[in-house]
């Protein structure tokens, strides 16, 4: 299991030097953020990114992510050229020794929260999703702004794309994902790249948009789209646990049994009323996920890939990108590494 940390590039207030000082830290999870979605990432740009990370004594563990263009998700005629570009990016990453790519197939929005700075009684702030608030939000009127999004839309563009998705139900989205997978995975497999689809976050429909990577049944359907370990998943326990109907430990065990876990996101959440939840500190006592059991499964199945603490609270007066501060994620990383050491030594 390789401990890793998300880095948003030169604009990230958390520096590579900061990350390198975290005990047990080995890898960086990052991307090239200024290439428009759908265009090829050149080898030169990948080399520059790789050199910068390695100069800090770290390595690129995972690319998160190479975004999937909306035209691919919508199944538009332009998708073939866009998929060709995606394949070339995969090949360029492989040529530079990068072998794991996290991506998602969520329509329009990446991870979605209703408050980016909910304040806990101790003064720390965290990301939360309030189901009641979400039902009152209108994305067309620009009431959403998230640091994790790869694109921003004008009001007119947002209306147009939301209208386009009105014609796409879950089965049609599955059909479009299948088309993408059958084009991408053979090429990824040929160059030794493991693709890792991230679950929808949260894993249920929002704003009337279809969501399909949502739980155990979805994972079992997904891996059958193309039988290859290159066609794998990102086991984001916080995302899957956000639906109270999901048993995240059952999902985790089954995903490992299928040998399709190519990347792990380990964060905790505290379930609330209905489908509401708050992101919490990583230790089990603060959330609804038994993190010890998650790490135990990683060891039981011999997981050797990258794991990252994913989101964290903002603590100790830190400001910056919500969910992606240094301090709480660093605490999370060392906590997860401590669990891993305890599991290993306890199994002897």
From Swiss-Prot:
Cited PANTHER family: MANNONATE DEHYDRATASE (PTHR30387:SF2)
EC category: lyase
Protein name per UniProt: Mannonate dehydratase
Protein's pathway: Carbohydrate metabolism; pentose and glucuronate interconversion
Keywords: Iron, Lyase, Manganese
Keyword Transferase in annotation: no
Source organism of this protein record: Streptococcus agalactiae serotype Ia (strain ATCC 27591 / A909 / CDC SS700)
Annotated gene: uxuA
EC numbers, comma separated: 4.2.1.8
